[in-house]
Amino acid sequence: MIELLKKLMGREDLTFQEASELIQWVMSEDAVAVQASALLVLLQAKGITDEEMAGAAYAMRGRVSKINAPQDVIDTCSTGGNGISTFNISTCAAIIAAAAGAKVAKHGNRSNTRKSGSAEALEALGVNINLGIEEVERCLVEIDLCFCYAVNHHPAMRYAGPIRSCLLYTSDAAD
């Protein structure tokens, strides 16, 4: 990771492979919090390229706990941490879309930068967000709406979550 740190300090772009390796490392028990924080901050400050975002997404998709869903399912994943301080639009949109007949697999987490993330909003409505994969799939089948709580669907984020929480912004590369 030292080589990536040097590269980012020089404001050099990472390759797809380097970005993927970085995010895999951040999401591992081997990650050193101070180094991971520095790397994520430098990446954000430099500006994340499409290649870096694709590498990060590839790394995350390789470690996700997937649900079985129909082809026509949609997701209203939150943009959280956008700095605009809006109310929880993505959660409202998920509920409205499902009520209108769409199949919605809402993905989200607790807030990192505002008062209420999707998890807090749904808990306030009495929703049990800590469901296993099979229970989430059953919700999607029975009511055309489910919540994929990030902590349960991205178990490797248990390592990255505390690192991201200590930063003053949400790092797009690890969302």
List each language-model region with its residue ranges.
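Acidic, glycine-rich active-site loops and adjacent beta-strand->loop/helix elements
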Residues: 78-83, 108-114, 153
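A glycine-rich helix N-cap at a beta->alpha junction
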Residues: 121-139
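General beta-strand structural signal in soluble alpha/beta enzymes
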Residues: 75-76, 104-108, 129-132, 147-149, ...
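Acidic, glycine/proline-rich low-complexity segments that act as flexible tails and inter-domain linkers
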Residues: 1-85, 100, 104
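Conserved small/polar residues in nucleotide/adenosyl-binding loops
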Residues: 169-175
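Alpha-helix C-terminal capping segments
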Residues: 45, 91-105, 123-125
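Self-splicing inteins and homing endonuclease
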Residues: 57-80, 133-162
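Short glycine/serine/threonine-rich phosphate/pyrophosphate-binding segments
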Residues: 82-94, 114-116, 157
